[in-house]
Design a protein with these regions (language model features):
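Conserved acidic carboxylate
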Residues: 9
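Two-component/phosphorelay signaling modules centered on CheY-like receiver
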Residues: 12-37
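Acidic, metal-coordinating helix/loop segments flanking the phosphotransfer/catalytic sites
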Residues: 32-60
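Conserved phosphotransfer cores of two-component systems
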Residues: 44-46, 75-85, 105-106
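Short, conserved "switch-loop" micro-motifs in signal-transduction and mechanochemical regulators
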Residues: 56, 93-95, 117
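The C-terminal output helix
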Residues: 126-146
Length: 146
């Protein structure tokens, strides 16, 4: 079974593009959604290895309220399953200072500017963060063992 990556994107064309890159180039199983409640449920119910999160999310709702990708990422971090889950922001916000501000505000792991041009680079970035998260989990597990 393939590793599961969630794509949180409210623009259908962008969702299809990121899904195609991750599934065909990366070999991942991909679930795309713009429903915040669904995203949190999937993270709690299935072994998700990474989340790619659009920052703007004009139509995304969580508990009936409109949220952006920064707020939804913070909610993911509140879940036990989300503490060490790699979250990579996808955004057209590419002005000087946007990267640092968005990473700080959201507690995401990384940032990719749209449009996505380097497909292999995106897959490599996702894999790098998955590997780092696995190393952290292994280290934490080793500390818990007497």
């Amino acid at each position: 079974m393939s590793e599961l990556v969630l794509v949180v994107e409210d623009d259908p064309a962008n969702a299809v593009l990121v899904d195609a890159i991750l599934s065909s180039v990366g070999g991942f199983e991909v679930v795309c959604s713009d429903d915040g409640d669904e995203i949190l449920n999937v993270i709690q119910e299935r072994p998700v290895v990474a989340v790619l999160m659009d920052v703007s999310l004009g139509s995304t709702r969580l508990g009936g309220e409109k949220v952006d990708g920064v707020a939804l990422t913070r909610r993911i971090r509140d879940l036990p399953e989300g503490i060490n889950l790699p979250v990579i922001l996808l955004t057209a916000h590419a002005m000087k200072g946007d990267r640092e501000r968005l990473l700080f505000e959201s507690s995401a792991n990384d940032y990719v500017a749209k449009p996505i041009i380097d497909q292999k680079g995106l897959v490599e970035l996702v894999r790098r963060h998955i590997k780092a998260a696995e190393a952290v989990r292994a280290e934490l597990g080793a500390r818990d063992t007497p």
